[in-house]
Structures are given as C-alpha cells and as structure tokens.
C-alpha cells in the first residue's frame, strides 16, 4: 500500500510547496486556505490565492482479492475505505463534504516527511505524479483533479464510466462530516470490485473537498487522518470487507407453512471438507447435489440440497436445504392423527431427517429435531 498528500500551500511570498513530497509523513492532512497568504505572481483561477491539499491512497488489491476469493464473489461483498481521524481535541473544520475518486494514473509515494516547512522535494507532488523511465510524469491538471469518463486519456481521476458493458454510472463516493472529527468511512464496493475484475485501473483513490467547497471563499483547516506510517497499526488506512456468511439454521424454530433453511456441516479432523460422491468419489459441489428426506409417521417430504453460497461463493463443506411443513396435511403422524391434531394433543412433533446424495444411494447424515 501507499499514501501521500499533495499541496500547493504557500511557504513564503514567492515559494509554494507544489514540488514538495510528504509521502512518509505519519498524517494525511486535508485542508483549504482561502486568501490567507499573499503570493507574488499569483495566476490562480479564483479571485484570491487558494491553498489546497488532496490525499492519495492505494492498497494491494491483489492481496485483498486473494483473501476474499475463498468466501465471496466480486458481486457478493461490500467494501469500505476507512481513514481514522487523529485531530483529537484540536480544532477541525466542520459541516463539509469529501469526495473519493478512483485515480486514473500511477503515482509515487515518495520519501518526504516535512509537513511544516515542506523542504523535502520529490514525487508525487502537486504538479508531478511520478518519475518514470527517467522522466517526470505530470498530472494532467495540477493537483491531480482533471476528472472525466473511464478510459479517457487526459484525466487524473475517474468520475463516471461503464463497467463491463453496463450502463454509465458515477464512480465516486462522498461523505458528509457534520462535526469534523468523524472517521472517513465510505462505500467503495463498485470501485474495488471493478478494479479487481480489471475494469478500473489499479491506481488507488484521491480524496478531496467536494464541489463548491473547493471554490468558495472559506478556509477549512485542518482535517487530519492517520497515514500508513503512523506507529499505531490500528489507526492506519484500511479497506474493510463485509459479507454475510451467517447460517440461520431453522431446526429449533421451524414454523408450519413457512419455509425454513436447515444446514449440514461436514468436517474432517476439525476442518471443513466437501462431501464425497458415493458413485465416483468426487467432491460434491454446487446446487442440487443432495436429496434431503424429512419424515415422521407416514408423512415424508423430499427437498433438494446443495452447497451454501451466502456471498455468491460456495462455502467449503457447508450444505443447506429449505423445507416447509403443512400443518393441515392429512397424512397421519401417530395413531392416525395428522399434524394439526397431533400438535394440539401433544404440543410437540419430532421430524426425522436423512441427507443423501441426489441419487439417494448414499446417506451422509441422519438425525431428528422437534
């Protein structure tokens, strides 16, 4: 992973930090200063000198993809970019919006550490993205804020695009900070999954103040996050992956005339392992590979079972089947009594279960539940 923040902060009346690098600093500082320092020969776009910073951050998406792949497909998880606030009790701007763009071109983290005088020169910085093949590679617009459509050749950040031939969609995320001391926590599911699938360039993200909050006549100093170089590992930037793999087994709370899911877990020496087919000794994977018989008295019903795929990814050694029992079925349960009569008389009902291969030749598990 890597991170940095780039800035055009004015150091003196004739010098700015536009070519300075702070890639090894322990903080990521997001700020805007409006008309607070004079600068000789200012030729900016606004009526007064405006000083900005913008954050750059990237992660090892190959490692992330490798850790996710056993449990979830690319469309089966949620991903969040997390930056920890370290302003503490210090004054911070409030009531502002941030925007998070996917970056379009590569950039260097750099070796700079000086966030006070900005004396460490290097790339990346406000003007230059990287030093590649013996040459400076400039941002398309100073400050890395040239935005546009995916696959455009003259952009620094991607604002929209079509992923895998789908409809055009916005590819940035936003967050509102009411009090100013909140952590940044934004949904980047689309951006990350598209990056891992090869539809977005794997260059990380740019974080900036959003829209008019970069062009208005207000100063916002300083929103400070921990960088990856902070000593506390729990404060470092991260991508949080979330997916739902819980198993809500209905054996002890089945309701008549309502479908419930039952689960079968197979372990060998404590480790999850797929069932083996009795006919050819191959792993039983996918849907509809099991036949599950539920019976009591003269009543029986068969349900199809298969591997459990909570995040669109089949889980090793976990199988599920869904079933519903009709309370008013006429088949006798005991002593010629049907479900309804038996329940009213005894207050309970025992159901037997048998998990078999789809051909019903091999039994993997038998049991019962009330």
For the regions a protein language model found, what residue spans apply to each?
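Secreted, disulfide-rich extracellular signaling modules
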Residues: 1-370
């Amino acid at each position: 992973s890597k991170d940095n923040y780039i800035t055009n902060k004015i150091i003196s009346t004739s010098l700015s930090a536009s070519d300075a690098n702070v890639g090894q600093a322990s903080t990521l500082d997001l700020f805007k200063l409006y008309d607070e320092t004079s600068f000789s020969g200012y030729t900016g776009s606004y009526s007064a000198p405006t000083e900005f910073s913008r954050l750059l951050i990237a992660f090892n998406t190959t490692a992330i993809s490798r850790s996710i792949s056993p449990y979830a497909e690319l469309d089966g998880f949620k991903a969040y970019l997390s930056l920890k606030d370290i302003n503490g009790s210090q004054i911070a701007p409030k009531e502002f919006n941030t925007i998070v763009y996917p970056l379009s071109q590569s950039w260097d983290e750099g070796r700079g550490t000086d966030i006070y005088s900005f004396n460490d020169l290097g790339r990346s910085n406000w003007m230059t993205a990287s030093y590649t093949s013996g040459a400076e590679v400039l941002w398309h617009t100073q400050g890395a804020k040239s935005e546009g459509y995916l696959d455009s050749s003259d952009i620094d950040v991607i604002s929209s695009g079509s992923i895998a031939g789908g409809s055009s969609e916005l590819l940035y995320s936003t967050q509102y900070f009411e009090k100013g001391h909140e952590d940044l926590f934004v949904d980047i599911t689309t951006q990350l999954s598209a990056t891992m699938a090869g539809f977005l360039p794997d260059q990380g993200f740019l974080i900036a103040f959003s829209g008019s909050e970069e062009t208005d006549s207000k100063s916002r100093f300083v929103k400070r996050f921990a960088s990856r170089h902070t000593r506390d590992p729990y404060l470092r930037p991260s991508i949080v992956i979330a997916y739902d793999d819980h198993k809500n087994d209905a054996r002890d709370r089945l309701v008549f005339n309502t479908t419930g899911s039952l689960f079968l877990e197979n372990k060998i020496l404590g480790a999850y392992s797929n069932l083996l087919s009795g006919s050819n000794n191959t792993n039983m994977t996918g849907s509809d590979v099991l036949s599950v018989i539920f019976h009591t008295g003269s009543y029986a019903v068969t349900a199809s079972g298969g591997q459990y795929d909570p995040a669109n990814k089949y889980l090793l050694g976990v199988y599920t089947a869904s079933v519903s029992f009709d309370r008013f079925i006429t088949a006798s349960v005991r002593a010629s009594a049907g479900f309804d009569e038996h329940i009213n008389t005894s207050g309970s009902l025992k159901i037997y279960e048998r998990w078999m291969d789809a051909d019903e030749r091999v039994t993997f598990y038998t049991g019962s539940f009330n």
